[in-house]
């Protein structure tokens, strides 16, 4: 689960005596300001310091920091828990970053996983560059490792299991790749050119199984993890309502996912081979990702339809906060 609920606290009452030294009074005032600042953690909106960001993915840490993958600038932006504006955290096109999509904060490993992809590869066109899953230290944004996708492809989204295994979707090749804890290279864990075509969002629930959606097919699937770690038969889940272009997806409970699709934020509850879809908010434009932190589900507006049209101003980008309590 990425998010957790923070309880609001009233700022402490500070009493001053006229005989108290000025230094102590200043320190006491600082305590009040810090306490008040922490109460602003439920930021209703996050903006960006730069234009043409096109934030395709986002993730968060327990302290409320938000990280965004910038598809427009091939960079990673961060908004700290005390800020309502995201600024560059990993510089544009540094460390071989290209076509930045998925990001995932793995606090247990102290790593921010980032999807970086080669261009081309569609309709038989050759790939240019290298598709890789990159690991950056959460402590200082330095590059810790880079793991190429065999045969390139399009690294789209990332999830991490309790045992440290990292899974990443490949949208172009219809597969899920795996990086075992301590491994030096990715391996192809699950592959099906038809069923996993346009594989996009990925998450794990308490059952330890891998859940993947397809942005092009509007489907949600479960891939069992066998005792030896290999992938079991892919199961297409029956959703209670159609899903239109499902994209970013995060686990927020034992059987619950948050999913963005068709301009909506959904709460999806898994029961066997069925998925109950509850719309939490609709009418949003160009949303592609969601994360939960501090009792707020943040949804990123990517507006990807304007990315390749330089004649149109996409306007300022933002991530909207929607109050949500994890189950």
Regions found by a protein language model. Give the residues of each.
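Short loop/turn segments immediately following the C-termini of beta-strands
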Residues: 71, 117-119, 171-172, 215, ...
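Beta-rich, blade/repeat-based domains predominating
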Residues: 49-65, 71, 94-120, 149-166, ...
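A short beta-strand motif characteristic of beta-propeller blades
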Residues: 43-48, 85-93, 142-148, 185-192, ...
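Short loop/turn segments that connect beta-strands within beta-propeller blades
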Residues: 80-84, 137-141, 180-184, 224-229, ...
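Short, solvent-exposed loop/turn segments at conserved positions within beta-propeller repeat blades
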Residues: 72, 122-130, 171-172, 215-217, ...
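Asp-box/WD-like beta-propeller blade repeats and closely related beta-sheet repeat scaffolds
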Residues: 127-161
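Blade-level signature of beta-propeller repeat domains, shared across WD40, Kelch, NHL, RCC1
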Residues: 295-327
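Structural signal for beta-propeller blades
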Residues: 74-77, 121-122, 133, 174-177, ...
């Amino acid at each position: 689960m990425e998010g957790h609920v923070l309880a609001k606290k009233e700022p402490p009452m500070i009493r001053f005596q006229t005989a108290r030294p000025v230094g102590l009074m200043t320190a006491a005032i600082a305590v009040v300001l810090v306490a008040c600042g922490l109460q602003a953690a439920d930021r209703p909106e996050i903006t960006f310091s730069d234009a043409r960001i096109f934030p395709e993915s986002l993730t968060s840490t327990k302290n409320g920091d938000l990280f965004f993958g910038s598809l427009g600038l091939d960079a990673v932006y961060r908004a700290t828990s005390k800020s309502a504006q995201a600024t560059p955290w990993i510089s544009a096109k540094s460390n071989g970053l290209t076509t930045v999509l998925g990001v995932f904060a793995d606090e247990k490993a102290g790593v921010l996983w980032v999807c970086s992809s080669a261009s081309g590869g569609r309709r038989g066109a050759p790939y240019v560059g290298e598709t890789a899953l990159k690991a950056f230290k959460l402590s200082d944004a330095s590059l810790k490792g880079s793991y190429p996708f065999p045969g390139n492809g399009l690294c789209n989204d990332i999830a991490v299991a309790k045992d440290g295994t990292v899974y990443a979707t490949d949208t172009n090749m219809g597969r899920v790749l795996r990086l075992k804890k301590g491994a030096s290279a990715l391996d192809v864990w699950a592959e099906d050119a038809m069923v996993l075509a346009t594989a996009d969002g990925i998450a794990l629930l308490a059952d330890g199984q891998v859940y993947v959606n397809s942005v092009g097919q509007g489907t949600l699937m479960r891939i069992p993890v066998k005792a030896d770690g290999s992938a079991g038969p892919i199961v297409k889940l029956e959703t209670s309502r159609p899903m239109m272009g499902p994209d970013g997806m995060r686990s927020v409970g034992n059987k619950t996912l948050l999913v963005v699709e068709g301009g909506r934020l959904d709460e999806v509850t898994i029961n066997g081979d069925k998925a109950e879809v509850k719309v939490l908010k609709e009418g949003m434009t160009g949303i592609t990702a969601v994360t939960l932190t501090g009792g707020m589900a943040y949804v990123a507006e990517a507006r990807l339809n304007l990315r390749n049209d330089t004649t149109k101003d996409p306007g300022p980008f933002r991530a909207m906060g929607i109050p949500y309590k994890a189950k």
